[in-house]
């Protein structure tokens, strides 16, 4: 069994990176809302759910159209993660209706954030900088040392209403778990 550890750090993007973050936040929100609308219509018509794999395939085709070509300019994994989050929200609603029906994300109400997964070293931390896909090297205020045996799993970038940017980095911690999955 693997334990996860998360660390939250402040990041200081330059003006160009702030624009890229804003585009990514907007595209993630647009993809989430587009597919939420599609899932609602499908469910109302024939009481079925559009599963993640179908959404991901259709989104890949959608990115090739001229109308949605702007989606190519942001991290594709972040877009896929928004579909996964939507799929999880739908599954949770059907398993436990008390969780509530998934809501549309708005510019005013929603928290600006996106998640991306580390694949083949596309996300790294070195010398006070965090390398993110399609964004590049972002200055990171690293106030904690991350143990060498940890393996980077995913990153969530968020922006507060005051305009500050933070990153929450999730790590696998293989050495923390002992025999039978119990902490040593």
Region spans (language model):
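Nucleic-acid substrate recognition interfaces
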Residues: 1-184
């Amino acid at each position: 069994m693997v334990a996860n550890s998360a660390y939250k750090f402040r990041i200081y993007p330059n003006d160009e990176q702030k624009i890229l973050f804003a585009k990514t936040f907007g595209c993630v929100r647009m993809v989430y809302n587009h597919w939420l609308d599609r899932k609602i219509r499908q469910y109302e018509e024939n009481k079925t759910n559009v599963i993640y794999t179908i959404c991901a395939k259709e989104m890949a085709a959608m990115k090739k159209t001229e109308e949605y070509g702007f989606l190519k300019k942001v991290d594709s994994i972040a877009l896929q993660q928004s579909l996964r989050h939507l799929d999880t929200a739908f599954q949770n609603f059907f398993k436990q209706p008390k969780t509530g029906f998934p809501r549309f994300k708005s510019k005013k109400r929603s928290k600006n954030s996106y998640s991306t997964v580390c694949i083949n070293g596309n996300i790294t931390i070195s010398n006070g900088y965090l390398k993110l896909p399609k964004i590049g090297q972002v200055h990171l205020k690293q106030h904690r040392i991350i143990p060498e045996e940890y393996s980077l799993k995913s990153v969530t970038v968020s922006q507060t209403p005051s305009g500050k940017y933070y990153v929450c980095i999730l790590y696998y911690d293989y050495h923390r778990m002992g025999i039978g999955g119990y902490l040593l």
